[in-house]
Amino acid sequence: MKTFTAKPETVKRDWFVVDAAGQTLGRLATEIASRLRGKHKPEYTPHVDTGDYIVVINAEQVRVTGAKTSDKMYYSHSGFPGGIKSINFEKLIAKAPERVIETAVKGMLPKNPLGRDMYRKLKVYKGANHPHTAQQPQELKI
């Protein structure tokens, strides 16, 4: 019996909607990253994108444990000397709540072209509304 390898053109991708309200950031991000990779499917193949589309709503209501609200820092650099910028979780969740979940999930995906394709299947919205109702996403409990 030969080893099964999924073909990119035969992969069936479903759409799921995840409510982030009251969820812990890390636990939510690990489950989302796993589903974006397709590890929950029996036909998972490491070198083929077998994952599903994930729509995350209520991103501004995600929570972190302990003192991470004020202590967790997000860094970015302009590329110029002295161009490092930092912002803590509390300010970032007020400014751009989508980026908190996107950053957490992106760090859990492969750092290569396949990982970038997986990341493009993640859609994050700060409110309860999203423009993907035409895809009829299924509710996913995490």
From Swiss-Prot:
Q: Does the keyword Magnesium apply?
A: no
- InterPro entries membership: Ribosomal_uL13 (IPR005822), Ribosomal_uL13_bac-type (IPR005823), Ribosomal_uL13_CS (IPR023563), Ribosomal_uL13_sf (IPR036899)
Cite the SUPFAM superfamilies for this sequence: Ribosomal protein L13
Q: Which UniProt keywords apply?
A: Ribonucleoprotein, Ribosomal protein
Q: Name one GO molecular function term.
A: structural constituent of ribosome
Q: Which GO terms describe its cellular component?
A: cytosolic large ribosomal subunit
One BP term from GO: translation
What does the protein in this record do? This protein is one of the early assembly proteins of the 50S ribosomal subunit, although it is not seen to bind rRNA by itself. It is important during the early stages of 50S assembly.
The family line of this record is:
Belongs to the universal ribosomal protein uL13 family.
Question: Assembly and interactions?
Answer: Part of the 50S ribosomal subunit.
Question: Per its record, how is this protein called by name?
Answer: Large ribosomal subunit protein uL13
Origin organism of this chain? Stutzerimonas stutzeri (strain A1501) (Pseudomonas stutzeri)
What gene, per UniProt, encodes this protein? rplM
